[in-house]
Amino acid sequence: MVTLSNTSMVGGRDLPSTGFAWWSGNARLINLSGKLLGAHVAHAGLIVFWAGAMTLFEVAHFIPEKPMYEQGLILLPHIATLGWGVGPAGEVTDIFPFFVVGVLHLISSAVLGLGGIYHALRGPEVLEEYSSFFGYDWKDKNQMTNIIGYHLILLGCGALLLVFKAMFFGGVYDTWAPGGGDVRVITNPTLNPAIIFGYLLKAPFGGEGWIISVNNMEDIIGGHIWIGLICISGGIWHILTKPFGWARRALIWSGEAYLSYSLGALSLMGFIASVFVWFNNTAYPSEFYGPTGMEASQSQAFTFLVRDQRLGANIASAQGPTGLGKYLMRSPSGEIIFGGETMRFWDFRGPWLEPLRGPNGLDLDKLRNDIQPWQVRRAAEYMTHAPLGSLNSVGGVITDVNSFNYVSPRAWLATSHFVLGFFFLVGHLWHAGRARAAAAGFEKGIDRETEPTLFMPDLD
């Protein structure tokens, strides 16, 4: 029987020689570094091909007169957030940049695909045959940390690419720009470590919101400067040093262990991304992704306040059915907030609402005299595009399923990342358990001799 703790038999790519059936995928290539490289490069090619093809699909179906979030788009909003093809208020001014991004991804996917095919079929089975620099052994702790170092440097460069785009190559879209958002060059990113790392020390609940509470582009770009430099510095550190004794003893050093570590990290990122896209309207502007749930609720309260005020209602003193303020009331800390069911979202901050605030919450004088037409239009739009799928009202938002066919990209992205994060967590636990069992020498493995498929006739 072949197990991960008994790999002396591993040599080919079939079940008898590796102990892994075809559906075990890359496990068959544990000791074939060249073939494993081919699998990884081809996988990257498939990912990039999807990105390019799906971008062109969205470009082909794009309707300029409708907001992106009403068209089920999940890729064009990311390109627009980077400042390509959009202008004031997030209006699409040119779809050619979207087309270019899609084509570039298709071209690069072809290069990656050819590289994957080459390494899978023609290249050296084991990279050590080609170069000692690219060769590795899963138990070679120093080489493993070298590979970590290369990855960290690439990740750091990726973070700095966003910085360069924001500061030197046309800027990025800032939903907080005056008048309803615009593309803006970030000239003064936040570098103060107390501010950047202060986000990590915030509570993850309520108005604190941990890193998800970031509400300005200066902090986002400054954070990427810090992350980029930290990743590059960490990469250089891991290349130049060898693992300390405690790390050698505490960690499991095998291919499956590295897989489990990676899945755990991706799971954490998935959960963070899920919450980020659900709550944050700075990194994920509502002009492209649609309003947050809290934003839609506050928009509805604002829309009806504007309507009834024009009809003569006294918004300051009108009472609702509970005896609380119908339009305005006090928060627990004394701020003036919207009344009604949306009171639970009194912590909400949005670029269309903030101009109407004063030193103590919403400013009554501004609500009576300074509401601008663009704020009313945007609130009405957001009110009818809540990222909700409920049969009843949520936060006071009417979610009648008979209205029109709409699913918010925010709901798609938040849900998909949460579900994927959960499955990656399960995968992390599964592979971590197997890796530790293999290292301890008591892994059972699966007795392939009694596997039913081995006794079935060929399909043809």
Curated annotation (Swiss-Prot):
Gene Ontology MF term list: chlorophyll binding; electron transporter, transferring electrons within the cyclic electron transport pathway of photosynthesis activity; metal ion binding
One GO term (biological process): photosynthetic electron transport in photosystem II
Regions of this protein lying in the Cytoplasmic compartment: 1-35, 122-142, 241-255, 437-460
Cofactor note: Binds multiple chlorophylls and provides some of the ligands for the Ca-4Mn-5O cluster of the oxygen-evolving complex. It may also provide a ligand for a Cl- that is required for oxygen evolution. PSII binds additional chlorophylls, carotenoids and specific lipids.
Subcellular location as annotated: Cellular thylakoid membrane
Residue spans, topological domain Lumenal, thylakoid: 59-98, 166-220, 277-411
Entries under SUPFAM superfamilies matching the protein: Photosystem II antenna protein-like (SSF161077)
InterPro entries membership: PS_antenna-like, PS_II_antenna-like_sf, PSII_PsbC, PSII_PsbC_sf
Main location: membrane
Alphabetically ordered keywords of this record: Chlorophyll, Chromophore, Manganese, Membrane, Metal-binding, Photosynthesis, Photosystem II, Thylakoid, Transmembrane, Transmembrane helix
Membrane-spanning parts: 36-58, 99-121, 143-165, 221-240, 256-276, 412-436
Function per UniProt: One of the components of the core complex of photosystem II (PSII). PSII binds chlorophyll and helps catalyze the primary light-induced photochemical processes of PSII. PSII is a light-driven water:plastoquinone oxidoreductase, using light energy to abstract electrons from H(2)O, generating O(2) and a proton gradient subsequently used for ATP formation. Required for correct assembly of PSII.
HAMAP family: PSII_PsbC_CP43
Quaternary structure (record): PSII is composed of 1 copy each of membrane proteins PsbA, PsbB, PsbC, PsbD, PsbE, PsbF, PsbH, PsbI, PsbJ, PsbK, PsbL, PsbM, PsbT, PsbX, PsbY, PsbZ, Psb30/Ycf12, peripheral proteins PsbO, CyanoQ (PsbQ), PsbU, PsbV and a large number of cofactors. It forms dimeric complexes.
Entry's family note: Belongs to the PsbB/PsbC family. PsbC subfamily.
Name the record gives this protein: Photosystem II CP43 reaction center protein
